[in-house]
């Protein structure tokens, strides 16, 4: 690849050595490279590689081609495992001079773990990596998360690392989308944890669980990351607030991954009811980012409305699917997907 990837210097070195002499010992090559490339921190990088390989070997985890760190959060990328890997990199950093090339190389190699941990924060299910805290009754973002996100952005910038993947999704867009997600995370969402009922059927992703829409975990930039998917059909879902409640604003996010036929909906309609039978429209939000050949490959859009003097128990969201990929798309006429996450009601 022309773009940086995890430990790409090491992998290039090992492949080149083995091409010249296939009889060389694989583990010896790894140790030799790490000791020279990372200085006194090299042994901790070697230990990291050994530990993560061991964890993968000990599970039935299947690594998808277009996978996401969230798929490994119950196995080799569990919160405790990620914490252990992070500590090894921090030990490596502590063993070399701050101004040395060794330090810069270790920081650069560490961003894969930083990325996985940032995605773990989104899930908001681990005490080791909490997304938010309450401070003096005010909901705030975990300061450690903010520091890690800033460091991730800085290291990528300093090393001219511009892409998150081979599909053209940029680091700049990733950080921007993440910051937008943090803005959502600190909202006082009265729909959080409330029961969601689906009137159309989802498919395959997020275990087809409607509660994904109100579970407090934020969808990332991959459709494997906490998004509820609908293939070729609209999304119709309603949430029960348990009692008549005053509401002032509503929003929900949708994902776009154009090369995988995942598009934003045509529009999103919000409705309210007191009895689940008679629904009144609160408003319809049109897609501001119409699909075209120059659309971002990977993007997240928030559909939101503000309302006044509305008291209700049930809130419904209807998202209109494009149904099929357009004629100019490589998947022309195939069913298109919409992916939704986190209904926010304030």
Q: Where do the model's predicted regions map?
A:
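Short loop/turn segments at secondary-structure transitions that flank enzyme active sites
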Residues: 2-3, 202, 276, 323
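Catalytic domains of carbohydrate-active enzymes that cleave complex glycans
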Residues: 17-198
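Predominantly extracellular/luminal regions of secreted and cell-surface proteins
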Residues: 185-218
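Short glycine-/Asp-/Thr-/Trp-enriched loop segments that recur within the blades
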Residues: 293-297
């Amino acid at each position: 690849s022309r773009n940086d990837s995890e430990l790409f210097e090491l992998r290039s070195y090992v492949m080149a050595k083995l091409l010249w002499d296939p009889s060389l010992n694989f583990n010896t090559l790894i140790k030799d490279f790490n000791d020279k490339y990372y200085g006194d921190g090299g042994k901790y990088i070697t230990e990291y590689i050994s530990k993560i390989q061991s964890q993968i070997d000990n599970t039935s985890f299947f690594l998808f081609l277009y996978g996401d760190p969230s798929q490994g959060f119950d196995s080799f990328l569990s919160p405790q495992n990620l914490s252990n890997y992070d500590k090894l990199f921090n030990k490596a950093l502590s063993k070399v001079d701050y101004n040395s090339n060794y330090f810069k190389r270790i920081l650069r190699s560490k961003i894969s773990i930083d990325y996985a941990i940032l995605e773990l924060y989104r899930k908001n299910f681990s005490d080791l990596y909490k997304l938010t805290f309450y401070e003096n009754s005010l909901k705030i973002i975990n300061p450690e998360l903010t520091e890690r996100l800033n460091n991730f952005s800085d290291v990528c910038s300093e090393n001219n690392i511009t892409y998150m993947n081979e599909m053209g999704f940029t680091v700049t867009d990733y950080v921007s989308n993440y910051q937008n997600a943090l803005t959502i995370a600190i909202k006082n969402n009265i729909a959080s944890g409330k029961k969601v009922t689906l009137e159309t059927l989802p498919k395959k992703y997020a275990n087809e669980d409607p509660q994904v829409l109100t579970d407090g975990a934020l969808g990332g930039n991959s459709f494997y990351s906490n998004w509820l998917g609908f293939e070729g059909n609209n999304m119709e879902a309603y949430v029960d607030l348990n009692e008549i409640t005053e509401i002032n604003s509503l929003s929900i996010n949708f994902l776009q991954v154009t090369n995988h036929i995942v598009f934003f909906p045509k529009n999103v309609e919000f409705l309210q009811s007191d009895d689940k039978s008679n629904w009144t429209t609160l408003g319809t939000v049109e897609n501001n980012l119409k699909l075209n050949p120059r659309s971002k490959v990977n993007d997240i859009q928030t559909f939101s409305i503000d309302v006044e003097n509305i008291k209700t128990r049930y809130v419904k969201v209807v998202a209109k699917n494009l149904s099929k990929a357009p004629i100019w798309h490589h998947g022309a006429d195939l069913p298109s997907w919409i992916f939704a996450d986190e209904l926010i009601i304030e």
